[in-house]
Amino acid sequence: MLARLRRDIPKLISLAGPLLIGQLAVITFGVMDTAMVARYSADDLAALAVAGSVFISVYVGLTGVVSALAPIAGQLFGAKRYNEIGEEVRQGWWLSIALSIVGVGILSHPEIFLSIAKASPEVEAKAVLYLKIIAWGLPASMAMRVMVALHNAVSKPAIITWLQISGLFLKIPLNAWLIYGGLSLDAMGAPGCAIATVIINWAWMLSAGLIIYRGSFYQIFGVYDKFSPPDTHKLWTLFKLGAPIGLSYLIEVTSFAFMALFIARLGTIALAGHQIVANLGTVLYMLPLSLSIATSTLVSQSIGADKPTLAKEVAWSSLIFTTGICVTVGLIVWIFKYPLLDLYAPPEGVKESAITLFLFIAFYQIFDALQVCSAFILRG
């Protein structure tokens, strides 16, 4: 067992490291939005919490479906059937377009979800505006997720990581300008975050597409070799594999995120406290998620190479390692809960509301690790 762990863990870390950095860069968008809006007003922070819970549920559910490309492309890569990967990517883009239409429709008419929150008219108006703005970035996000799946499948996550880090550095000045105003622009508060995110989503998509078009490594896949109309058989295969993934993502995320809609009934302070804790919980989730994505990549490549025994060994090594890491993280969160909360610099009332929830964040780390790692092993 120890020999197996010593063999498999370095491979996991080499893949999961760039994934984790990239995921944290993306999640830092949310941390940054929360921290910067918290300094603007409690109403805007509450609007961000309500709108964010709706957006993340839609986004994660839909991107979960297109993530089915990763194990398919991973098995083709492991089997050295490189020329078939390009067609799968093209069909993935068609699927992303169809799903984007659904997602944009939901985000553009969010009133049915926001009615659950029973928030004040001011908070609801800002939440609606946030969602209608960020809907413009969803098609780019969906297309980008197809390219992320491709890079994960062929063990090239670092390229996406660099794009995500670049986006983070662009997000900081955009957020400051759009949230607080300046240079003849009025302060926008929470909706300003949405505009910044939309700009970066489109920049990411165009940059990733250009890298695939120009990079010599990708030429063997033939992604841009020809135009492919929608193939109902391939689309159905992708959707059939991806729908359970998207549904599992949706259930997991909404069980936590949609709580914001119910907590909104308790008032702005309670909702703002929940937003901070939910935000921190999302950041912590990136560690088991990155390790699990790396596991899925190695498992799918091993299966494609007709090495089922190796796939099983990698799966067990990852399950043990990921769970151990997350137990340690849970303990650290509980011990350092006050310094972690102080990073958000919330008002005293919000701080008191948030601190009581830290025990739950620390406690569920072990179950999160077991669940997400097992799920990605099965998807591989």
Functional labels for PLM-detected ranges:
Residues 14-33, 133, 137, 144, ...:
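Transmembrane helical elements of multi-pass membrane transporters/channels
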Residues 4-35, 39-40, 53-72, 96-104, ...:
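N-terminal transmembrane alpha-helices
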Residues 45-104, 108, 141-160, 273-337, ...:
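Small-residue-rich hydrophobic transmembrane alpha-helices
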Residues 19, 23, 34-35, 52, ...:
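Transmembrane alpha-helix boundary and packing residues in multipass membrane permease domains
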Residues 27-46, 114-121, 177-188, 250-283, ...:
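Helix-terminus/linker motif at the lipid-water interface of multi-pass membrane proteins
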Residues 1-16, 73-139, 183-243, 299-364:
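Short alpha-helical transmembrane segments in multi-pass integral membrane proteins
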Residues 42-53, 127, 131, 194, ...:
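Small-residue hotspots at the loop-to-helix junctions and early N-terminal turns
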